[in-house]
Amino acid sequence: MTGAGTAATSNLIRSLRAGADSLFIVGAHSDRFFLRKSSADANYLLPDLTHPRFFPALRRVLAKERIDLLIPTTDAEVRALVRPGRRLPCRLFLPRKAVVDVCQDKYRLNVRLRSRGVPVPATYPVSGLGAIDKTFRRLADHERVWCRIRVGSGSMGAIPVKRAEQARSWIAYWDEMRGVPATSFTLSEFLPGRDFSCQALWKAGELILTKTCERLSYFGGGSQPSGISSVSQLAKTVREPRVVEVCAAAIRALDRRASGTFNFDLRENARGVPCITEINVGRFASGTNVFDLTGQHNLAATFVRVALGRRVDLHEEYDAAEGYYTVRDLDTLTGVFRTDELFDRIVDARE
């Protein structure tokens, strides 16, 4: 497992140990400081993903430890592993390269899904600073507009704006200070409704298992210009069949033989329709515990079983475990609580 020692990988390891405690987990990272925090059974320091020696070193580790399955934890790793010619002495369970390429460009994804009738926000690419006024006129029916970078994660470069000059100044700042050109941005309708996350597992075009949650507050949201982030601080499990239907339609629009895990971000539009804003393809959400430590099925552990060719008696299973909350904060273990546990060991002294 890559990214050993990071919050995302540590959460994933926690989930796997809860669902399949006999697993021997090997962690790897290119940063020795993160690696020192890893909870894996064995840990290896690798060159950076961009270094020519990365894949030779990775192959040596995979062979030495007789690894059965490699699980990437970042978009860059997923992108690198699906390239043609990447021969590894173990299994991968990832979507096809064409699917990864589309999903990792939010505008391309938006165009593909819209053309297939899947709900997405109205979105336009920025061709240059001089074209922003024209785009705003196309979005004139919306009080606010969402300005964002079309690649990457963590809500990088995302901000709500009301006027064209706000978007122009924001994009110009990123160009001058961070080297991100105007053409890397999109402008779209602002979605004002509820914010959902969905994780789904597919194999050969068959939906196996889906889980959903709703983000209620955001980690670091108060310090973000947008007031939100893709990382929830407080989330709850929910039963939302509409969300599952939209996500399933999206995958079928992308690949009729889809395999792997897909993490969806969705938000309701003004009419209450859940719209897909992005799909993190081939990897788990950093807050995967909400999907793995609740309900009848541990999604991460099920992923491993399916990836290794084990039989699982699940077909289009929607494991909606209502009544759980997760709480996340810096340098603390993710808390997973049932509703009836929220006030355990708490005395109300407000009166």
Feature annotation, model-predicted:
Residues R36-S38, R53-P56, D101-Y107, S155, ...:
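Short, charged, surface-exposed secondary-structure boundary motifs
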Residues P160, E189, A200, L266-E268:
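Conserved hydrophobic "DFG−1" position in protein kinase catalytic cores
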Residues E165, S169-D175, A182, S188-D195, ...:
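ATP-dependent carboxylate/phosphate-activation module, predominantly the ATP-grasp catalytic core
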